[in-house]
Amino acid sequence: MNKLKNKVAVVTGASKGIGASIAKHFAVEGAKVIVNYATSKEGADKVVKEITDKGGTAIAVQADVSKEADVIRLFEETKKAFGTLDILVNNAVFQQFLPIEQVSVAAFHQHFDVNVLGPILTIQASLKLFGDKGGNIINISSGASKYPLPSASLYSATKAALDAITISLSKELGVKNVRINSILPGATETEGATSAGVTSGSEYEKMFIANTPLGRRGQPEDIAKAAVFLASDDAAWITGEQISVSGGMYGF
């Protein structure tokens, strides 16, 4: 408890799934949390209520991370509410399973605008609030960045790009006392995975479980606990890394 006491954290895409779990785990550890959402105000408000009902501090802020003006407003609201920023979690994601014949220009931009441009914009904005004290960035990537999935060429490519950004920026931002790491979740049960076609009993789920040594799909809290570790001083000498949290599926 209190590993993140008095820290201020922005978690993008935090109205459900992994992002919601990270926001709630951060709050339990003492962080003040900005629960970002793009469209699901109801979900974000629910996360905030769960946090505040337990004595934590959180606010919900709408922003589409692929839009520069929205990102600027997100961090202006953060500064207005808490005056500073210590932790950024880039969790907002767009994902579709599409065979190559169905990949459109629009689908390309949807994936890359949210999954690659979004983190670039939020990182730029966060650096201004980190200031001289430095900060901590966690990018939620995917094991698909190392082991691309069939019918997921766009999604896999965006996550590979995000890992490259993590590595490059670790070398650039270390002198500013900013740590940056990626978490690579395995097959995790989330609303997003379900909407992408990974449903209970589906062939995708059977494939994932068959290739996971621990024999189950992950839960959002499995990822959230790793995020707490990376956000805390326990990980003070860790930067530029890709941490696989996959039940052994993505061992590398």
Each language-model region and where it sits:
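A glycine/serine/threonine-rich, flexible loop-to-helix segment
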Residues: 175, 187-212, 222, 252
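Active-site helix of classical SDR
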Residues: 123, 158
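Conserved glycine-rich cofactor-binding loop
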Residues: 8, 15-16
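Short C-terminal tail/terminal secondary-structure segment
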Residues: 147, 228, 239-252
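Alpha-helical segment proximal to the catalytic Tyr-Lys
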Residues: 128, 171-175, 236
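Residue(s) in the substrate-gating loop at a strand-loop-helix junction
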Residues: 142
